[in-house]
Regions:
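Glycine-rich phosphate-binding loops of nucleotide-dependent enzymes
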Residues: 2-251
Length: 254
């Protein structure tokens, strides 16, 4: 029996007497886009931090390829192939695109104590990987701050894919972007899916989710209140579920 790439089983996260997430069960498969939707205060931020290894679940199971895991830090999650692109992107605006692409993972050449950065190779890889995602860079030396918000998201996605992500968690990647830039980001979400990555798309925008999603989970007040598969999902129903909020609690179907 094939296991999902990532699975949460009845996960709860509490902080003292405050329960931030409760009864969260989701499945995330390779080469699919799983959308987790919810308005402000729905519990998305806590769930992202649990998925990315910032928080440990208080209850329930976290499985990666069928094996229960216990992450102590985001580095543990990253080592397991779970990469997260947060809203702030963790890029340095005044640093070049290629330096941002390899920051913390620089390629060196030389031997023994005599080592230096292999700048040429890193520039070549940056161009190749971005081109594979459909981004034709003018110059990898340009500061990443000169790129649009959508293009910076694309660089962050390509970086995660190159460094071995099996699961890519995107935290509100289209938030605060215009129509054109949102379209650019959604294009690269699908490009990651086509490369076999299991994508988790966190958003409060049902229209953006419906354009790329294969599976949809709706959160409200920290609980999973509805789930849909692409084959049975309807944009109007998804939008109504988002707008209905508490009226949807207790309804779940696949």
């Amino acid at each position: 029996m094939a296991h999902s790439t990532l699975e949460l089983v009845d996960v709860e996260k509490s902080f003292g007497s405050v329960i931030a997430n409760s009864g969260i069960s989701v499945k995330v498969d390779s080469a699919t886009v799983t959308c987790i939707l919810g308005d402000n205060g729905a519990g998305k931020s806590t769930l992202i931090k649990t998925l990315s290894g910032v928080h440990k679940p208080s209850k329930g199971k976290y499985l990666v390829e069928g094996v229960e895991v216990d992450f102590n830090s985001p580095r543990d999650a990253l080592d397991a192939g779970i990469a997260t692109v947060f809203q702030d992107l963790a890029t340095i605006p005044l640093m070049s695109i290629w330096r941002n692409f390899f920051i913390g993972n620089e390629i060196e050449k030389g031997f023994g104590p005599f080592k230096w950065l292999d700048v040429k190779k890193m520039k070549e890889i940056t161009k190749q990987e971005l081109l594979a995602m459909g981004i034709d860079l003018r110059d990898p030396n340009q500061n990443i701050g000169t790129l649009s918000g959508g293009e910076r998201q694309a660089v962050a996605i390509a970086r995660a894919v190159y460094f071995g992500a099996k699961v890519l968690i995107l935290d509100e990647p289209t938030s605060a972007l215009g129509v054109r830039q949102s379209g650019i980001v959604l294009k690269y979400v699908l490009a990651a899916k086509e490369r076999g990555i299991a994508v988790i798309f966190i958003t409060h925008n049902p229209n953006h989710a419906f354009l790329v999603g294969d599976r949809f989970y709706l959160l409200n007040r920290g609980k999973l209140v509805q789930s849909m598969e692409r084959a049975t999902a309807d944009i109007d129903e998804l939008t109504k579920a988002m707008a209905g909020g508490k009226d949807q609690i207790g309804r779940a179907h696949v």
